[in-house]
């Protein structure tokens, strides 16, 4: 991956990191990943087009499974996208499910972010928590490269490839959280 002029610091960090990863894989496991690995990585990186997606990918490789808590500003954008995708997501997944967290009623719903360029390669599908008035108040997602039948063939191929980094212990899945969620209730 060549560095382009005018890149942000995050872009430069990610480019350097991916170049290092590619070089390490070439030196250590050329026969396992081969030239196709480099092409798929470049293809995948071209799709990671928002600062949030880049941050999530770097976290995957560098934070050893440490939970990420998103900022209020990021959650506001996620919440706006979730509200816009809520009806369409109900057709793909279940509708809102009543949950009680710390004695209060909320509704959790799986939301697909695959139609959102800022969050598709970071969240994919995530659980958003809504208060009784339907206002988003929380987020729970596991950043991983798991198989999913709802993805198109190309996205599933990218996911399968990236999962190999986890299997080789070069990366680790982690939770992405914000506000009200039931993550601690299930662990």
What residue ranges belong to the model's regions?
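Catalytic toxin/effector domains delivered as secreted proteins or via bacterial secretion systems
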Residues: 38, 42-46, 53-187
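Membrane-interacting helical modules
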Residues: 5-8, 12-19, 23, 31, ...
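Residue-level detector of alpha-helical secondary structure
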Residues: 10-22, 26, 37, 41, ...
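Short intrinsically disordered, low-complexity segments
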Residues: 8, 28-29, 33, 83-91
């Amino acid at each position: 991956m060549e560095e382009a002029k005018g890149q942000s610091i995050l872009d430069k960090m990610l480019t350097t990191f991916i170049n290092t990863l590619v070089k390490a894989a070439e030196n250590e496991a050329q026969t396992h990943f081969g030239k196709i690995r480099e092409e798929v990585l470049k293809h995948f990186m071209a799709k990671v087009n928002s600062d949030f997606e880049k941050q999530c990918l770097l976290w995957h490789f560098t934070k050893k499974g440490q939970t990420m808590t998103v900022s209020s500003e990021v959650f506001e954008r996620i919440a706006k996208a979730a509200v816009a995708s809520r009806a369409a997501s109900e057709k793909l997944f279940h509708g809102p499910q009543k949950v009680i967290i710390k004695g209060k009623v909320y509704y959790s719903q799986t939301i697909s972010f695959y139609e959102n360029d800022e969050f598709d390669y970071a969240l994919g599908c995530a659980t958003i928590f809504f208060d009784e008035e339907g206002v988003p108040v929380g987020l729970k997602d596991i950043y991983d490269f798991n198989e999913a039948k709802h993805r198109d063939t190309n996205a599933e191929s990218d996911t399968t490839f990236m999962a190999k980094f986890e299997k080789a212990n070069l990366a680790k899945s982690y939770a992405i959280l914000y506000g009200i969620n039931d993550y601690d209730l299930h662990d």
